[in-house]
Amino acid sequence: MGKLFLLMAALMGGVAVHAVDFSNSAVWDNIKGCCIRGVPEAATVKAASEYLDSVDANTVKADWQKRAMIRARVIVFSSTAGVDASFAGLKAYADNLIAGTEFAKPMSVPEYLGLFNNWWRNDDLQYAKDFYEYMKATPGSEKFPDLGLWAAALGKYEEAYDVYFANKARFTIIRMVRIALDHLDDPGKAFAAAKLMVSGQSCTAPQVKEVMNLVAQRLIGNDAIPEAEMKGFLKNVNRKYTAYLPNDPQTWEPIISQVRNLLDAY
């Protein structure tokens, strides 16, 4: 039925529209041009909007798929010339979409906040301030790791580190290390964050590489880090991530080599 409606709309409007099934990666590929600092080209925004309109609603079934489509529409809307792209404006737009969508379960607070997590606007101080203040006034926001991103955007680096550390999301480890080194001047906190790589869920290769580069450049040999603790950390990184070598040696070999070279120094 969704494809029939799209075909009828295309015929009435004289525009060729081809319905496509929902694909999260395809949605992102078609809207990522709107996720930039500054103003996207009008043609880019138009193409993104038209792609979202072409997605067959009958293939958007699961709650996460519905959230992904709303998130995508919020992103495109925020890049559209002449609209109210303030946090209040985006919230009103998203709330209207949510009201017209049937969910199996209500959104959690972190899921809702994710609709407005336009990280490329973290240097827009008014947007950052409004979004941050909304989160601080909303119970449950402390479970949204990117509260730390918006705290950092406002110069609240201690809070940003604490939010990240409490949530322990893998993608925030490098942020914690950088905040601790560049803004808090606290190698101990940087090391505590780095050690999260060896506890719980594994990090991706790029995440491990970024963290290990900073460990090598700024923590190895630092008097604030006891040698025995650093050696233990390096051993654990070697043990945990060597397991990934056989399946993807090209990606992991340089990373594991660096870890082992650092271990040899001890």
PLM feature segments, named:
Residues 4-13:
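Sec-dependent N-terminal signal peptides
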Residues 34, 78-80, 119, 151, ...:
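Residue at a conserved register position within TPR or TPR-like alpha-solenoid repeats
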Residues 26-43:
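Alpha-helical segment of the N-proximal tetratricopeptide repeat
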Residues 229-266:
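Terminal, low-structured helical/coil segments at or just beyond the last alpha-helical repeat
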Residues 15-19:
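Sec/Tat signal peptide C-region and signal peptidase I cleavage site
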Residues 20-31, 62-75, 104-114, 127, ...:
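Generic helix N-cap/helix-start motif at coil->alpha-helix transitions
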Residues 47-55, 84-101, 126-136, 158-167, ...:
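Alpha-helical repeat scaffolds
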